[in-house]
């Protein structure tokens, strides 16, 4: 299965009548492996900050997490594995695998829990595949 198919079929799938606003699979260096049409362009320093938070959980909490200049308040995730952010009625979930970052961005009416489920399920699957 292509990386684009993982984004289209697994991340952008319909959940209880809703779907993510945008999604992507990135390399740890920020290289885009596949993305949805509306996925924002990360800046290199944003990826650096995200990767540092995986290595040093809590790094982003004081300043927030920036994605394409949009600021997300960092909320509880899983240290070293999942970063979650909130911005207004939406948010972001980032799951780190051995080689990739699985990213989902949502807006209401999708819930944070639905976003977490979609992103983390694919991330867990990729980890089991050695990715």
From Swiss-Prot:
Disulfide cysteine pairs (residue numbers): 13-115
Where does it primarily localize? cytoplasm
Q: Which residues carry this modification: Phosphothreonine?
A: 111
Q: Which CDD domains match?
A: PROF
Which keywords does this chain's UniProt record carry?
Answer: Actin-binding, Allergen, Cytoplasm, Cytoskeleton, Disulfide bond, Phosphoprotein
Q: Does the keyword Lipoprotein apply?
A: no
PTM comment = Phosphorylated by MAP kinases.
A Gene Ontology molecular function term for this protein is: actin monomer binding
* Renumbered ranges of motif Involved in PIP2 interaction: 81-97
Looking up Pfam families in the UniProt record yields: Profilin
Q: Which domain of life is it from?
A: Eukaryota
Q: Which InterPro entries match?
A: PFN, PFN_euk, PFN_sf, Profilin_CS
What role is this protein assigned? Binds to actin and affects the structure of the cytoskeleton. At high concentrations, profilin prevents the polymerization of actin, whereas it enhances it at low concentrations.
Subunit annotation: Occurs in many kinds of cells as a complex with monomeric actin in a 1:1 ratio.
Q: Which family, according to UniProt? A: Belongs to the profilin family.
**Protein name in the entry:** Profilin-5
């Amino acid at each position: 299965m292509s990386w684009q198919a993982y984004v289209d079929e697994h991340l952008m799938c319909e959940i209880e009548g809703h779907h993510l606003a945008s999604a992507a699979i990135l390399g740890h260096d920020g290289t885009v492996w596949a993305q949805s049409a509306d996925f924002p362009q990360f800046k290199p320093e944003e990826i650096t900050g995200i990767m540092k938070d995986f290595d040093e959980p809590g790094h982003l909490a004081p300043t927030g997490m920036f994605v394409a200049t949009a600021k997300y308040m960092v909320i509880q995730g899983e240290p070293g594995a999942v970063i979650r952010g909130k911005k207004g009625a939406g948010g972001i979930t980032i799951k780190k695998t051995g080689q990739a970052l699985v990213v989902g961005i949502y807006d209401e009416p999708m819930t944070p829990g639905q976003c977490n489920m979609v992103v983390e399920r694919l991330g867990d699957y990729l980890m089991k595949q050695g990715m």
